[in-house]
Amino acid sequence: MKLAHWMYAGPAHIGTLRVASSFKNVHAIMHAPLGDDYFNVMRSMLERERNFTPATASIVDRHVLARGSRKRVVDNILRKDKEESPDLIILTPTCTSSILQEDLKNFVDRASIISDCNVIFADVDHYQVNEIQAADRTLEQVVRYYLDKSHTLDQFVTDAPSVNIIGILTLGFHNRHDCRELRRLLKDLDIRINQIIPEGGSVEDPKNLPKARFNLIPYREVGLMTAMYLNKEFGMPYVSTTPMGAVDMAECIRQIKKSLDILAAPILSSKRVDYESYIDGQTRFVSQAAWFSRSIDCQNFTGKETVVFGDATHAASITKILAREMGIRVSCTGTYCKHDAEWFKEQIKDFCDEMIITDDHAEVGDIIARVEPSAIFGTQMERHIGKRLEIPCGVISAPAHIQNFSLGYRPFLGYEGTNQIADLVYNSFALGMEDHLLEIFCGHDTKEIMTKSLSTDISPIWDPESRQELGKIPRFVRDEVKINTEKFARQKGLLNVTVEVMHAAKEALS
């Protein structure tokens, strides 16, 4: 565990809750003190769901500390079983309640004897892993639980080409849009989708996972452990190349073809898809990104520097797109997924000047300040850093704020995703003529303190000391302070604003 003002990846219980609330008819109970139960509000705000988030807090308070948690935890499990009739209840502690070192697994075993639904304890080390690792582990645990429970499995794969998409979940960065784009891609390739988990899936679905011919893992962060388990237990091949960008899209499609050819079972398909012709047609005519990268607009980016930072999947993919497909220099790229550092380094070693593996936003901010790039592509934190340094930033990875949970269709994967990324890159830079005009006219985004007054009265003159004092006031109240001070000065018949006048105005308005 780590005490920090801000973190890229949240605590482990958030990952477990994300997986639980992605499945249909699954309820999560977190054994937590007040303050750790913010997930419900966060998910409702960002995902803008109509339904309530299926998560309940079993509060750790002074009574629990005095008597122990067993009765309260078991009672909460049985109450939710009766009220919601879920297929599964997942119990998880938080990093705070884990300090109590209670045997919650024993409480789950006791409750599962009495309850009508299945109950499992999230087997996650809250001291060692973060939100992403916990989500990956919890999904694998749920799949393993239901496959172990189904002793007699129909091991025959489907006659038609089929796939499981593993790793689409709630609060994922553009995950729902990406899922729609993957559906369209697989339909074009005449591949039937067997299961999509966990988002929108039922916990009864995992027992049918082995029927698919292969598994597709769009993001390394969640789903890879499940795919590796299915590969080990059932010999199912999996594709983990993220279909982001024209080059990796082509590579992903070729790996899909290779995975379909692995199994000896004959494929009965209504049509034979020429994969190479499909790649060529989509790259040349559907995706506008390939054409755009050769246009004069994209050539204007030559020589401009960028910094990329995000989760391993998105940071690596965006770095390769910028350097390989758009010819933009990536001065530094990095990820906060320290557990996946080796894979990340291998992916981007030929596409950037330097790399950073850290979960400390201050280090990232220092690098951005040193490099002074023309644009940043990162998370919500890099967006804040960019605003402070007056550098434009495109958000390409979680964690993100509500503006990146768009209602409109904005995938990052697939051929439509290449268009979205090209737009994001183009709009994140100051355009060529815009740069030129800013130089000529000394910039339109002046740092001078502006007034919003429509009055025709002559404004009092601010002396250098008072201007410096005004500049120290936070921006969100600065204009109001300026207007109130000038109004006070006019009422007193003063032509000059000094620091003393500012203090007098403040006292008069207090």
Swiss-Prot record:
The active site is at residue 297. [4Fe-4S] cluster binds at residue 36. It is found in: Plastid, Chloroplast. GO terms for cellular component: chloroplast. CDD domains: Pchlide_reductase_B. Its cofactor is [4Fe-4S] cluster. Keywords: 4Fe-4S, ATP-binding, Chlorophyll biosynthesis, Chloroplast, Iron, Iron-sulfur, Metal-binding, Nucleotide-binding, Oxidoreductase, Photosynthesis, Plastid. One of its GO terms (biological process) is photosynthesis, dark reaction. It holds the Pfam family Oxidored_nitro. Belongs to the ChlB/BchB/BchZ family. Component of the dark-operative protochlorophyllide reductase (DPOR) that uses Mg-ATP and reduced ferredoxin to reduce ring D of protochlorophyllide (Pchlide) to form chlorophyllide a (Chlide). This reaction is light-independent. The NB-protein (ChlN-ChlB) is the catalytic component of the complex. This is Light-independent protochlorophyllide reductase subunit B. It comes from Pinus koraiensis (Korean pine).
